[in-house]
Each structure stands twice: as structure tokens, then as C-alpha cells.
């Protein structure tokens, strides 16, 4: 899979995109990441990419001409096509389902907004999708782009073990079960005995119940989504009912 990132600050990406899983994925040829400095498409000697907003107001706005030229040049590269995604606080909220969807694509073009945003006409003409990583404001879209690349890349086949993906938090709307490693006792705290039993069936059942318990305690809103998606078994529902879950989400009764 190919990631193209259009940004005013390409140096911000050098550390996060060249370490750990992303580094190994690139070395293995599973993904490629290409950084593009939007200033390279500015036409004046000062490489101007922003200007004051029409109508007045605080801050600056990213100009249409250099940004549009950058997007079109990247789209014209001799590679498979891909959607243009703008990272912006007013986009749809990014989640694991969107990450899975994007991971099926051969290419993704990410545009990092900055200042007060980009000229609206570029959004109307060239942007296919808008994504936000949360209900807060960052200095620019660079950090959001890093989050999207990391979340999507790990779902590309061959990047990480498929079993690890299945058991991760949010893979089926449930949070992940607790993890333990050696030593068996640390500062008086012992690893649950079931994990030392070698009984794989019992361990699997314990892990499932812990996923349900943790989700109920920390993110009960996810349980209604899990039930609606059909990922909760009768045994799951019985256990949740025993713990007091009544099928309600944050917005009311589960539909």
C-alpha cells in the first residue's frame, strides 16, 4: 500500500514513520510512504502557501493554488489511484472501522491542513473524504496523519500477525483483555492462575470474559454497537446481564 502525505512540515514525520512496525513494513515492501512539501508548488520566490481570509478574522488560510497543484501532481504519479483525505477537526471521527476500510485500498493521499484551514474551494473540488482523530484542535494535520498511517498500515496484510489484529481492542467493538508476563508474582501481585494452567480452552474463555468485563467498565457505549453488529454470543449476553448490563447505550435503549 502507498501513502502520500502532503504537508508544510515534512520533517515532522521522520521519527514516527521510520521506527518500529512502520519501519519494518517499509523494509519488507508492504507499504511505502512518500512525503510531499506543499511549498514546492508555490510560485513566488517566498514560497507563499497562505494568505489572510476574505471577510476578515484571525489567522491565515492555506491558498488554493499551491495546494491544488500539489494534490494534482501527486495524483498524476504513475501509481494506482487513491482517495484524497483531508485531516481536519470537522471531519468524520476516525475509528477502527474506517481504518479497516482504508487498509483495503492500494493508495491513500493524506492532506495535512494548517493555520485556520484550507481554501474551501479545494475541499469542494479535490477532497474525497475528511477525517478527524478527535474532538480537539491540533496545530496542524500532521499528527493526525501519523495516527491514520499507523492505524491503517498495521492492518495491511503481512505487516503484523493476523491473530494479533483479531484480538486487539476495537477489532470487534470490545476492548482487549489484560496481559501478563514473567515474573509470575511481582510486588505481591500474582498472575491469574488460569493463565498458568496450560488449559487453552479455559484461557480463551477467561480472556473473552475479561474483554467483556473491561468494555462494560470502561466503554459501555461499545457494547450496544457490538450487539448490533452480532458479535456478542448468547453466553456473552448472559454474562453481561449477570453483571448488570441492560442493553442500554449512551443514547438510550439499544436498537
Swiss-Prot record:
Positions annotated to bind S-adenosyl-L-methionine: 113, 133-138
Keyword S-adenosyl-L-methionine attached: yes
Keyword S-adenosyl-L-methionine: yes
E.C. code: 2.1.1.228
SUPFAM superfamilies: alpha/beta knot
GO molecular function: tRNA (guanine(37)-N1)-methyltransferase activity
This protein's UniProt keywords: Cytoplasm, Methyltransferase, S-adenosyl-L-methionine, Transferase, tRNA processing
GO cellular component: cytosol
Gene name, Swiss-Prot/TrEMBL: trmD
UniProt-listed GO biological process terms: tRNA N1-guanine methylation
Record protein name field: tRNA (guanine-N(1)-)-methyltransferase
Amino acid at each position: 500500500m502507498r501513502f502520500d502525505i502532503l504537508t508544510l512540515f515534512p520533517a515532522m514525520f521522520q521519527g514516527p514513520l521510520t521506527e518500529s512496525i512502520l519501519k519494518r513494513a517499509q523494509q519488507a515492501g508492504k507499504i511505502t510512504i512518500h512525503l510531499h512539501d506543499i511549498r514546492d508548488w508555490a510560485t513566488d520566490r517566498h514560497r507563499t502557501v497562505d494568505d489572510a481570509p476574505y471577510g476578515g478574522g484571525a489567522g491565515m488560510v492555506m491558498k488554493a493554488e499551491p495546494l491544488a497543484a500539489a494534490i494534482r501532481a501527486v495524483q498524476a504519479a504513475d501509481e494506482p489511484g487513491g482517495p484524497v483525505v483531508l485531516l481536519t477537526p470537522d471531519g468524520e471521527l476516525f475509528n477502527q472501522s474506517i481504518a479497516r476500510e482504508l487498509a483495503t485500498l492500494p493508495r491513500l493521499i493524506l492532506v495535512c491542513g494548517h493555520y485556520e484551514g484550507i481554501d474551501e474551494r479545494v475541499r469542494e473540488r479535490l477532497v474525497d473524504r475528511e477525517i478527524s482523530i478527535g474532538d480537539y484542535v491540533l496545530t496542524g494535520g500532521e499528527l493526525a496523519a501519523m495516527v491514520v498511517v499507523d492505524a491503517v498500515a498495521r492492518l495491511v496484510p503481512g505487516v503484523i500477525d493476523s491473530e494479533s489484529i483479531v484480538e486487539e481492542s476495537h477489532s470487534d467493538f470490545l476492548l482487549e483483555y489484560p496481559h501478563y508476563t514473567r515474573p509470575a508474582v511481582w510486588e505481591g501481585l500474582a498472575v491469574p492462575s488460569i493463565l498458568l494452567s496450560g488449559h487453552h480452552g479455559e484461557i480463551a474463555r477467561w480472556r473473552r470474559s475479561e474483554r467483556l468485563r473491561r468494555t462494560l467498565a470502561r466503554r459501555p457505549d461499545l457494547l450496544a454497537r457490538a450487539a448490533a453488529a452480532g458479535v456478542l454470543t448468547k453466553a456473552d449476553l448472559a454474562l453481561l446481564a449477570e453483571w448488570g448490563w441492560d442493553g442500554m447505550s449512551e443514547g438510550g435503549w439499544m436498537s
